[in-house]
């Protein structure tokens, strides 16, 4: 199996990418807020740039929207691949990890983001005991 190619950039180069992404995505009126998360944020070497966006209204085709936005980002971000995911309706674990481990790229409406965080954290912690039981019984993992 082939290894993923990693990119190793200075903090200045990463900051330049963040500025480019923020400018592009903040200019999109349908995006209320965005998180940057994943290896680009957590490690010196990254494989892709993970961006989670919250939309005011969902498009007819979520996949088409994500691919179109990824293509736009690829035109302004180098090096690397940008992986866009929509937070609206995303799995709970994804939403929680984007909030917990990522950082806010921008927000246009802090109340909307605060509501999103409140709902996500509430659902996550309500579900946590069931997740622990599942992991223990199905996978033998103690949490």
Model regions: which residues?
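Short beta-strand->loop micro-motif that forms the acidic, two-metal-ion catalytic signature
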Residues: 50-54
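Catalytic core of pol beta-like nucleotidyltransferases
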Residues: 1-35, 41-46, 56-143
């Amino acid at each position: 199996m082939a290894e993923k190619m990693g990119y190793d950039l200075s903090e200045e180069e990463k900051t330049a990418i963040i500025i480019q992404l923020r400018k592009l995505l903040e200019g999109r009126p349908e995006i209320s807020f965005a998180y940057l998360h994943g290896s680009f944020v957590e490690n010196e070497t990254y494989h892709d740039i993970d961006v989670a966006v919250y939309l005011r209204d969902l498009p007819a085709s979520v996949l088409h929207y994500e691919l179109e936005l990824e293509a736009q980002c690829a035109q302004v971000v180098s090096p690397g691949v940008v992986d866009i995911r929509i937070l609206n309706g995303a799995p709970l674990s994804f939403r929680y990890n984007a909030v917990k481990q990522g950082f806010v790229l921008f927000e246009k409406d802090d109340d909307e983001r605060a509501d999103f965080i409140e709902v996500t954290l509430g659902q996550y912690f309500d579900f946590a005991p069931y997740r622990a039981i599942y992991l223990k019984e199905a996978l033998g993992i103690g949490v």
